Amino acid sequence: MTQEPGYTRLQITLHWAIAGLVLFNYIFGETMERAYDAVRQNVEPAGVGHYLHVVVGLAVLVLTLVRIGARFVLGVPEKGTTPGDKVAAGLQGLLYLLTLLVPALGMTAWGGGQAWAAGPHVLAANAIMLLALVHAVSALFHQYVLKDRLLLRMMRPR
């Protein structure tokens, strides 16, 4: 993986697309819960919200795989060496892991009919939201308190 000064337009687009899709699915996640309850009662789920949730979840999975591949092909900015930089790198790694794990658990629960995966799916989705909040607050702290322009790396392509 090469060290680059910033991110490419593709990497930035993938970052924000994945973030938006994750947020969308989190906000409208109750449609899946209602659909799951209906199926357990042998009733056809109402509406199309659950289908949309599945499609968006699959998109998150595919886009995350593309984003990980892009990291290796296109490179990423050099990582810092401070303890805070190491925490940030760990947080980023967890976000990547969760954006793969949540759709996989969702597919296992819904598509695979494995009810045990529904609880971990929801728990991991909640973890994504918590870590994304920490990630966003940290980026804003860098931009507006430290004034190191770190946030611009994910807004302006190299």
Swiss-Prot record:
Keywords associated with the record: Cell membrane, Electron transport, Heme, Iron, Membrane, Metal-binding, Transmembrane, Transmembrane helix, Transport
The keyword 4Fe-4S appears for this protein: no
Annotated protein name in UniProt: Cytochrome b562
Residues annotated for heme b 2 binding in this entry: H53, H121
Organism: Cereibacter sphaeroides (strain ATCC 17023 / DSM 158 / JCM 6121 / CCUG 31486 / LMG 2827 / NBRC 12203 / NCIMB 8253 / ATH 2.4.1.)
Regions that span the bilayer: 12-32, 46-66, 87-107, 121-141
Similarity remark: Belongs to the cytochrome b561 family.
Signal peptide extent: none
One Pfam family, short name: Ni_hydr_CYTB
Cofactor: heme b
Domain of life: Bacteria
Membrane topology: Multi-pass membrane protein
GO-annotated biological processes: respiratory electron transport chain
